């Protein structure tokens, strides 16, 4: 067979016939991929448009939330400076005063400027409900008074309170809770396949690269539409793949981490399990002392969010962002603190990564939010960890 092919290729007519047969096979295969790509586009196109529009709006979610909630989130400028803030433990006590008994505080978003309220995310779980309620509480940092509350997920209600929570729920779950988040994650996987099939269809089989990389001027509307789709699809393919891959990670983190763990088992994301050491006669030190302990060791950057210990062996977690000297793509440092001794247990930042899996997972949020390219074009987005606060668990 190989000898016959060699003879065919040595003959000019044989070469032409072989090339024609090969091109015919490639075109038939391309037609199949075109069908797959077209159907995937029809099925997912509308939802992808929703994800794109809501994601663009959420780039400015903080400014939007401030503007729409004066007096609740954006406060009157009565006093300047964090030195006038009430102790964080007082803030926590004020927030707890309006929460039900079974509330579980998730994250506490520290004011990003002097005129913004603390924002608490908490869940209420009942014995007979698979999906918990998710609510926000806002507290004035100067007076430790609750300025407002709102429901993100509430039993008996389809829509959340407020424009920003609505955008978040629509963006990652299509307003369908945990089930919607899984469905959107699966859509992300299928969309990745759609992008890859699009690249297969785009590939110029006859070597006409200029036609594949440019838009023909003065073309018919049909040809213009084809060229725009084909050309912009190629030039944005890497961006689309990065956004889709990171989106799958955020919606399906447990499934996403399985191959990462197989390829990089020593990643701290899988091995770190900091725990406090309870002892008789010792009580938790409180969030103020935990925060002070972290700031003594790491004074640079600004406090981003805080988390309280869960259970007797739980730890305080404190996030500091915009830390000078760290990676320009990921300038956050997360520190865990023993709730009884105040000892710093772990530090997670770009300087402490131990394996490729850590870097890969840490890159997911900068890629999705656009922070990875902010040096070239300033981009905005949620701080690390905060995006999960708008979803049920």
Task: For the regions a language model picked out, list residue spans one by one.
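Conserved histidines in hydrophobic membrane contexts and catalytic metal-binding motifs
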Residues: 2-393
């Amino acid at each position: 067979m190989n000898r016959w092919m060699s003879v065919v290729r040595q003959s000019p007519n044989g070469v032409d016939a072989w090339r024609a047969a090969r091109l015919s096979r490639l075109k038939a295969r391309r037609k199949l991929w075109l069908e797959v790509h077209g159907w995937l586009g029809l099925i997912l196109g509308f939802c992808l448009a929703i994800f794109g529009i809501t994601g663009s709006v959420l780039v400015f979610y903080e400014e939007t939330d401030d503007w729409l909630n004066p007096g609740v989130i954006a406060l009157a400028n009565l006093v300047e400076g964090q030195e006038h803030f009430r102790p964080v433990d007082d803030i926590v006590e004020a927030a707890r005063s309006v929460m039900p008994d079974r509330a579980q505080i998730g994250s506490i978003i520290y004011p990003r400027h002097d005129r913004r309220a603390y924002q608490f995310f908490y869940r209420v779980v009942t014995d007979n409900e698979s999906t918990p309620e998710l609510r926000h509480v806002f507290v004035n940092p100067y007076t430790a008074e609750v300025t407002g509350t709102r429901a993100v997920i509430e039993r008996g209600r389809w829509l959340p309170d407020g424009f920003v929570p609505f955008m978040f729920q629509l963006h990652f779950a299509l307003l369908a809770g945990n089930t919607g988040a899984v469905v959107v994650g699966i859509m992300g996987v299928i969309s990745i396949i759609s992008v890859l099939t699009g690249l297969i269809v785009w590939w110029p089989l006859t070597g006409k690269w200029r036609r594949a990389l440019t838009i023909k001027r003065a073309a018919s509307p049909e040809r213009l539409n084809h060229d725009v789709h084909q050309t912009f699809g190629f030039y944005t393919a890497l961006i689309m793949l990065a956004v889709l891959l990171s989106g799958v990670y955020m919606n399906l983190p447990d499934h996403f981490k399985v191959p990462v763990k197989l390829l990089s088992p020593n990643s701290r994301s899988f091995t770190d399990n900091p725990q406090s050491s309870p002892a008789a006669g010792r009580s938790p030190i409180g969030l103020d002392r935990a925060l002070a302990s972290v700031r003594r060791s790491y004074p640079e950057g600004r406090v981003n969010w805080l988390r309280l210990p869960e259970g007797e062996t739980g730890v305080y977690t404190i996030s500091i962002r915009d830390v000078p000297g760290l990676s320009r793509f990921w300038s956050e440092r997360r520190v865990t603190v023993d709730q009884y001794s105040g000892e710093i247990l772990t530090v997670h930042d770009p300087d402490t990564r131990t394996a490729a899996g850590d870097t890969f997972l840490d890159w997911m949020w900068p890629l999705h939010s656009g922070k990875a390219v902010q040096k070239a074009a300033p981009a905005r987005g949620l701080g690390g960890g905060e995006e999960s606060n708008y979803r049920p668990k």
